[in-house]
UniProtKB/Swiss-Prot annotation:
Disulfide bonds: none annotated. This is Endonuclease MutS2. GO terms for biological process: mismatch repair; negative regulation of DNA recombination; rescue of stalled ribosome. It comes from Ligilactobacillus salivarius (strain UCC118) (Lactobacillus salivarius). ATP binds at residues 334-341. Endonuclease that is involved in the suppression of homologous recombination and thus may have a key role in the control of bacterial genetic diversity.
Amino acid sequence: MNKKVLKTLEYDKVKQNLYAFTTTSMGKRLIDKLEPSSDYDEISNSLAQTKDGADILRIKGGIPVPNLISIKSFLKRLDIGGTLNSKELAAIGRVLRATNEVNRFFKDLADNKIKLEVLFDDVAKLESLPEISKKLLVSIENDGHVTDDASTLLKSIRQQISVTEETIRERLNAYTRGTNSKYLSNAVVTIRNERYVLPVKQEYRSKFGGIVHDQSSSGQTLFVEPAVIVELNNRLRQQQVAEREEINRILEELSKELAPYTHELNNNAKILGMLDFINAKAKYAHSIKATEPILSKENDVYLRQVWHPLLDMKKAVKNDIMIGKDYQAIVITGPNTGGKTITLKTLGLVQLMGQSGLYIPAFEESRIGIFDDIFADIGDEQSIEQSLSTFSSHMTNIVEILKGIDEKSLVLFDELGAGTDPQEGAALAISILDAVGAKGSYVVATTHYPELKAYGFERPNTINASMEFDANTLQPTYRLLIGIPGRSNAFDISQRLGLDKMIVMAARQLTSQDSQDLNEMISDLVAKRHDAEEKEIMYRKYLREAEELHHDLETNFHQFERQKENMLEQAKERANQIVEETKKKSDELISELRKMKMSAASNIEEGSLIDAQGRVNALHQETNLKKNKVLRKAKQQQELHPNDDVMVNSYGQRGVLLRKAGNHAWEVQLGILKMKIDESDLEKIKVKDTQPKRAGAVLKSSSSSHVSPTLDLRGERYENAMVKVDRYIDAAVLAGYNSVTIIHGKGTGALRTGIINYLKQNKAVKNFEFASPNNGGNGATVVYFK
């Protein structure tokens, strides 16, 4: 990337903004080296790092990288056997401490299943060096102070120094607090030449024995070391020398122990600097509300609602800028001060940011290209500092640009062809654009020459554009209008500002009809565009409301489905419960019938059997009769009369009404029996449904004639077979069989196993066994009842 365009587009100002978010000198050095890249993989990896940093900033508030200085020069000294001072060792200690903290931080991210694209791999390269790290951190504090724990000898020497200093202070306090204090300029103990002294007034020098070490600038105060503490000061000096010697020994020892790890320490410092740099990119992106760009290898640029990164997002006008897909050249026409130059700079600088791995100031889903180089000729005539730009300097720059461009270049021309005769300037501008197009480069050019308005219509892969101007307020809106060439507003502005109408009309007549027609066409296009934009806003609103309604309906539908499933589950549970209760009662009744059968030898009295059968039927009727309001109401509304044929629901038997037996009861003839039945248990039968009654019919227990002593299930599906077994066992018990045979076949054994499990749970079954070999063996089971 050519260096000139970085200066022209103020790339360094973006880097200056990044500096504010760094905490290490290594991170600042990476910003110094930051430049746009044209390598897809390099840009992609850099953006992935920025994304990881942005995710960490959002979730955890950033990567914990503290203030660190570069240790590169310190490590070089260690490589040649040098000894570092305590502050230099402290700087290395801070790097090791930061390394440990960063390792813990990323381990916590991993434990919490936080997903990152690249940083886990980068951080895995950090070397903790636990042993030397622990020793260094114990021996040297952050500010470079060597701690008492650095060695036993150092701790002992410092204890001796403390005792000696305390003794000296006690001796001197006798002077500062007693009657001798009047001889002192100040009643304080001070130090001169590393020895404790007293500030004695000049005239009382003879009152004190000892050594004079210094005097005040006025000569009125002498700093005297009293004779009584000379020996103590000498002892203190010896102890301080011993302390320095021990500290130097400790520093030398630590330096030697660190020397083998200079490569690891240098690598750690680089990674911490990189993390600081990533932190800065993420924080800068957050500060300007930037988003992650999509990389387009085809250089299909689409910046959605982009704004200049050096402008306040809240105040800057946002524009959609597109180039590369449908066209490779944009010609922005129209008068000055409309925002053409800032639009050019925005496109160029945002493209540089994206190719540097930075987030861009645009809405999400914006795309940037990957250009090998970006060229710009922007004189910025609106800037006072650049007001000396001339046609010659512009043309010199353009000549250099044309030499360096190819199909992977983006070229930005501001006021192309300006600074010379308008007719010649327009012709030059057209020729230059043709030359750029011939090399396949992407180009955006601004101009105020009306001749270039037709260029976008005549040239392939080229489109016109303009900066919107509000005719009502006579102010530019700074909005980019792709597809609409700029129009002159001079006549309208002049008339609004008070220029005589006749003068304006005369001026219009002096312009060509084609020019007037073009301006009217442009005005019509602008009006239609405004109408389309308003409709788009309205349709987007309708779409958003429809999407919200769809979401609500979908949510309610899913909620309804969940409620339905819950109700079905509850109903199934209740049904299963009822079935279990019913089966239990049925088993009890069947057992009772067997006892009755056994006690009666062969026949069961009709009344007992009917009563038992009625109780079985009642099990099936109970729930329905209680819950079915329609059936209850129908029963209440039916009119019963003597001699009516009725169904006794609880017994499942037909009968004939004889007479009323109370408010809600009837005497009913059931076979040879007469029974009193509650009216709610009776259901009137229509005459056509009845059959001729046989008088004196006797109900016998010999129902065994209708039940076979053998049940053959061969060829049946498992589910159907188990249902038949259940029904068959009940029927066999009611029929009074002592034993029956169930033929299930051998097959896979699944049906046999299911039948055996069923028989084990059936209370009416006494025991069971496989049939004899000549009667089917384990392909048939003989069941014995209680």
